[in-house]
Each structure stands twice: as structure tokens, then as C-alpha cells.
Design a protein with these regions (language model features):
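Short hydrophobic/Thr-rich beta-strand motif most characteristic of the beta2 strand and flanking loop
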Residues: 26-34, 42, 185
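Short amphipathic alpha-helix used as the core "switch/output" element in two-component signaling
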Residues: 41, 63-75
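Short, flexible helix-to-coil linker/hinge segments that flank and couple to helix-turn-helix
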Residues: 88-147, 200
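Recognition helix of helix-turn-helix DNA-binding domains
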Residues: 155-190
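Active-site beta3 strand of CheY-like receiver
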Residues: 46-52
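Active-site residues of response regulator receiver
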Residues: 54, 82
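Acidic catalytic/metal-coordinating carboxylates
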Residues: 35-38, 59-65
């Protein structure tokens, strides 16, 4: 029996995925999470074989959850199921130790098979995303530039970003300028859009 935690912030989608997977005799859904922080907590407490998670969720992204599980040396394997087929997300997922990456439009039997394969220690990647990632540019941003851009993308001021990241407003301005230059962006809004479109945020 494969023990599974499902993390998805849209209640209807969470219910649909859980209902489909409940039909599989060898899959046991031991927990459901509505955001990234809850997903991380359940994964650490329940130690399922597989955490099935979306990427973009409140509090922590699925990529952040995967990275924290890897940092904690957790044996929980992570399978990302998302609407975002961005090559940058796939690269970050692989760097975070994710075992699988599928799009939400995958067939139910393909999803169940991917869970089994990831639980067995194999890697499963949607072929379309893998092909796109092979030719996509590498992420030029540092972790700090990405964190600053992420908060700028939420509409926060330099002062608010500085408070959140323990940086001075001048340092925030420098990180935004460096990120903008790397991305060829005229301003912070354009830099955020470019980074988001590539899956780097």
C-alpha cells in the first residue's frame, strides 16, 4: 500500500484528485493539505511514501515544500502535479529533489502510475515539459534576487521587502536592479513578469 498526502489549494480540485485516487486499491490517502505550510507539516508528521502537490499555493509553494523536505533529509518522495508547464519550474523541481512532474491535464491512470513509479524511486516527467526544458534558458537569478522579485511581484514596496527579508531598502533596490539587468527588463514589474513567465519565481 502506498501512503499518500495530497496538497492542493483549490478545494474542488483537491476533492476531485482524492476521489479519483481513492479508486486505486494500492493507494491510501492519509492526509490532505490546502496550502504549502500544511503540506510540509503533514509530510513531516505522517511520513507518507509520496506527497502529491501543486506548485503555486499559499504560504509555501510546492517547490519550497520539496526543497525543505530534501533539506530535512525526509524520505518522503514528491510528485508535482500542476497547470504550469514552465521549464524553469521543472529545473527548480529537479534541484529540489522532486521525483515527478506532471501536468493536471494528465489522465487519471497516468497519475496513479506516476505515483507508483515515484514511490518506487523512479523519476517521472511529463514529456512535453521535458522537451521544453531541454531548450529553455537557465535561470540567471540568485536565490536572493528571486526572493526580492517574488515580493515585488506581490506589489510590496522596497521598504516592505526589506523588512520581510531583513535588508535595507537600498540593498533591495540593488537586488531589483541586478535582477532587471539580468532579465533585460526596464522595471521591476517587467522583471517580475519575465521571471514568472519562465518559471523562475
Amino acid at each position: 500500500m502506498i501512503r499518500l498526502v495530497i496538497a492542493e489549494d483549490q478545494a474542488l480540485v483537491l476533492g476531485a484528485i482524492a476521489s479519483l485516487l481513492a479508486l486505486e486499491a494500492d493507494l491510501d490517502i492519509v492526509g490532505r493539505a490546502a496550502d504549502g505550510a500544511e503540506a510540509l507539516d503533514l509530510a513531516l508528521k505522517l511520513a507518507p511514501d509520496v506527497l502529491l502537490t501543486d506548485i503555486e499555493m499559499p504560504h509555501l509553494s510546492g517547490l519550497d515544500v520539496a526543497a525543505q523536505l530534501m533539506a530535512a533529509q525526509s524520505p518522503v518522495k514528491v510528485l508535482i502535479v500542476t497547470t504550469f508547464g514552465r521549464a524553469g519550474y521543472l529545473r527548480r523541481a529537479i534541484d529540489a529533489g522532486v521525483g515527478g512532474y506532471l501536468l493536471k491535464d494528465s489522465q487519471a491512470d497516468r497519475l496513479a502510475d506516476a505515483i507508483r513509479r515515484v514511490a518506487a524511486g523512479l523519476r517521472v516527467i511529463d514529456p512535453e515539459i521535458a522537451a521544453a526544458a531541454a531548450f529553455a534558458p537557465a535561470d540567471p537569478l540568485t536565490d536572493r534576487e528571486r526572493a526580492v522579485l517574488r515580493l515585488a511581484d506581490e506589489g510590496r514596496s522596497n521598504k516592505e521587502i526589506g523588512r520581510a527579508l531583513s535588508l535595507s531598502p537600498g540593498t533591495v533596490r540593488n537586488y531589483l536592479a541586478e535582477a532587471g539587468a539580468k532579465l533585460g527588463a526596464a522595471n521591476r514589474i517587467e522583471a517580475s513578469r519575465i521571471a514568472r513567465d519562465h518559471g523562475w519565481l
